[in-house]
Amino acid sequence: MFNTYILELVNSLHIMNKKTESLETIAVIHCAHEDFPRTVALIEVDPLLTDRIKIEMAYELTNSHDVEWWKNKEVTKMFPNKTCRSSDVGDQVLIEDRKYAFNGERGATIARVDR
């Protein structure tokens, strides 16, 4: 399970590296409950993080906890409606040319999607 402390630590490291490192943009694609895949969010992450941490961040940042997920500062909303469901098992994350699917509780387990 993704720890909130780790997310806060990653965010603080990101702030420290922001001036010297360019950010990487990853995409969250909802396809678990839709007729066709839809990119719902772009998320800026530190490129030095592992794919695993980037995926954990993508899952946490696209789930509503205390506030709607699209209001997170790291998230660029890509859906046309006023609201959008939270990410779920079966949804995907695109990191460069690598696509992963959330396939466990709270995104803790990931699977590489074949091209």
At which residue positions do the language-model features occur?
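A generic structural signal for solvent-exposed, polar alpha-helical segments
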Residues: 11, 36, 42, 65, ...
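Short, compact, well-ordered microdomains
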Residues: 83-115
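Short, conserved turn/kink motifs that form compact alpha/beta structural patches or helix kinks used as
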Residues: 44-95
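N-terminal disorder-to-order initiation segments that are Gly/Lys/Arg-biased
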Residues: 2-56
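Catalytic phosphate/metal-binding cores of nucleic-acid and nucleotide-processing enzymes, i.e., regions
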Residues: 12, 35-37, 68, 98-103
